[in-house]
């Protein structure tokens, strides 16, 4: 990433953790520093990616879409996003704020779906070729609370319809990944919005200070 002039900041977490709100806050903080930004989401963010998203998230494909197919669709969408959107933005000095990235696949497919992490890592190496975020914020929320918050948004999609045990496995895997990768910043999202935003602001302001 050192050859690229922009920065990639990723927001991670379970459903209901407040990722969208966090993305908006980060954009606001960066704009105050006159930093040009774009936002992305996964899966999606490109024409092809949005088509793949509609397949992955569609409840009609419950018990139909094979876990392996889901994994490959996610990486297909991610490749398109990196090559069509993220890298071009970074190369012209824009900062990219992403709602989900690679960590989600490790947590959801590796943890939630119980897929072999070695297979996922091999696929990641092939598809991403070492491409990594400059900063990852993981919003940590209790799965039950997260689903209550997510339900308030409306009808559940295919992923959100999974069992609470599924989300507990994801939550546990996120914690393992954070311990294995100390550069990931974990923020307690069980707290009030004001407290969460204050923590995010502190992390982002320190990151800006060291990268401008």
UniProtKB/Swiss-Prot annotation:
Q: Name one GO cellular component term.
A: cytosol
Q: What are the record keywords, sorted?
A: ATP-binding, Kinase, Nucleotide biosynthesis, Nucleotide-binding, Transferase
Q: What one GO molecular function would you report for this record?
A: dTMP kinase activity
Keyword ATP-binding belongs to the record:
yes
Annotated Gene3D superfamilies: P-loop containing nucleotide triphosphate hydrolases (3.40.50.300)
Claim: Secreted is one of the keywords in the record:
no
A biological process (GO) of this protein is: dTTP biosynthetic process
Q: Which reaction does it catalyse?
A: dTMP + ATP = dTDP + ADP
The record, for CDD domains, names: TMPK
**EC number annotated for this UniProt entry:** 2.7.4.9
Family note: Belongs to the thymidylate kinase family.
Xref: PANTHER family: THYMIDYLATE KINASE (PTHR10344), UMP-CMP KINASE 2, MITOCHONDRIAL (PTHR10344:SF4)
Reported function: Phosphorylation of dTMP to form dTDP in both de novo and salvage pathways of dTTP synthesis.
The identity of this protein, by name, is Thymidylate kinase
Q: What is the lineage of its organism?
A: Bacteria, Pseudomonadati, Pseudomonadota, Gammaproteobacteria, Legionellales
> Gene name?
tmk
């Amino acid at each position: 990433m050192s050859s690229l002039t922009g920065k990639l900041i990723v927001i991670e977490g379970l459903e209901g953790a407040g990722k969208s709100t966090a993305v908006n806050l980060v954009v606001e903080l960066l704009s105050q520093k006159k930093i040009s930004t774009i936002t992305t989401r996964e899966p999606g963010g490109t024409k092809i990616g949005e088509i793949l998203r509609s397949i992955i998230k569609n409840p009609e494909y419950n018990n139909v879409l094979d876990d392996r197919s889901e994994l490959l669709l996610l990486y297909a969408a991610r490749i398109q996003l990196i090559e069509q959107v993220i890298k071009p933005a970074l190369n012209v000095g824009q900062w990219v704020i992403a709602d989900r990235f690679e960590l989600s696949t490790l947590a959801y497919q590796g943890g939630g779906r119980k897929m072999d992490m070695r297979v996922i890592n091999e696929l990641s190496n092939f598809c991403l070729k070492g491409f990594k975020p400059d900063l990852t914020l993981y919003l940590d929320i209790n799965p039950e609370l997260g689903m209550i918050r997510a339900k308030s948004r409306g009808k559940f999609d295919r992923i959100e319809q999974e069992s609470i045990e599924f989300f507990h496995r994801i939550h546990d895997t996120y914690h393992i990944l954070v311990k294995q990768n100390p550069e990931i910043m974990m923020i307690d999202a069980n707290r009030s919005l004001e407290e969460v935003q204050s923590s995010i602001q502190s992390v982002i302001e320190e990151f800006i200070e060291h990268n401008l």
